Amino acid sequence: TLLLTLVVVTIVCLDLGYTLTCVTDKSFGGVITEECAAGQKICFKNWKKMGPKLYDVKRGCTATCPKADDNGCVKCCNTDKCNK
């Protein structure tokens, strides 16, 4: 039973098989998501103001946090759907 306990604790601690889910688009009906590929452990939201109440927004999975464009902003996070 000690061996079984150690195996269970190891699996829980390693969190084997976990895949991050990030938002890729938003609409009035909700959000569209994707499961991130291996090595992509960050969700991002990159937005830039294009005019009054008009923004160009990109969302998705990434391995590294992207840099903001001129006059743009970036949010990076690492929990499911954190980039709404």
From Swiss-Prot:
Domain of life: Eukaryota
Localisation: Secreted
Disulfide cross-links: 22-43, 36-61, 65-76, 77-82
PROSITE patterns: SNAKE_TOXIN
Tissue-level expression: Expressed by the venom gland.
Any Gene Ontology CC annotation: extracellular region
Coiled coil: none
Key words, A-Z: Disulfide bond, Secreted, Signal, Toxin
Any GO MF annotation of the entry: toxin activity
Signal sequence region: 1-19
Record has Disulfide bond as a keyword: yes
Gene3D superfamilies xref list: CD59
Record Pfam families: Toxin_cobra-type
Subunit (UniProt): Homodimer; disulfide-linked.
Entry function: This protein shows a synergetic toxic effect in that it enhances the toxicity of other toxins.
Family per record: Belongs to the three-finger toxin family. Short-chain subfamily. Aminergic toxin sub-subfamily.
Name recorded for this polypeptide: Venom protein SynTx
The organism of origin for this protein: Dendroaspis jamesoni jamesoni (Jameson's mamba)
Lineage of origin: Eukaryota, Metazoa, Chordata, Craniata, Vertebrata
